[in-house]
Amino acid sequence: MKAQDLREKSVEELNAELMNLLREQFNLRMQAATGQLQQTHTLKAVRRDIARVKTVLTEKAGA
């Protein structure tokens, strides 16, 4: 997910994307805790995607 793509979305779409990412992060954390997660790099990728969405939301709030 690129920040450029996120900047083209509306605030409502960004909030929906953020909620989906937070749900996905929760599920991945639970899988990691129970030892079921094979691709541990996805945790880092989702965390950074969440940060990107939050950054764009903050930019839009200030503009």
Swiss-Prot record:
<dbReference type="GO" id="GO:0006412">
    <property type="term" value="P:translation"/>
</dbReference>
<dbReference type="InterPro" id="IPR050063">
    <property type="entry name" value="Ribosomal_protein_uL29"/>
</dbReference>
<dbReference type="InterPro" id="IPR001854">
    <property type="entry name" value="Ribosomal_uL29"/>
</dbReference>
<dbReference type="GO" id="GO:0022625">
    <property type="term" value="C:cytosolic large ribosomal subunit"/>
</dbReference>
<dbReference type="InterPro" id="IPR036049">
    <property type="entry name" value="Ribosomal_uL29_sf"/>
</dbReference>
<dbReference type="GO" id="GO:0003735">
    <property type="term" value="F:structural constituent of ribosome"/>
</dbReference>
<dbReference type="Pfam" id="PF00831">
    <property type="entry name" value="Ribosomal_L29"/>
</dbReference>
<protein>
    <recommendedName>
        <fullName>Large ribosomal subunit protein uL29</fullName>
    </recommendedName>
</protein>
<comment type="similarity">
    <text>Belongs to the universal ribosomal protein uL29 family.</text>
</comment>
<dbReference type="InterPro" id="IPR018254">
    <property type="entry name" value="Ribosomal_uL29_CS"/>
</dbReference>
<keyword id="KW-0687">Ribonucleoprotein</keyword>
<keyword id="KW-0689">Ribosomal protein</keyword>
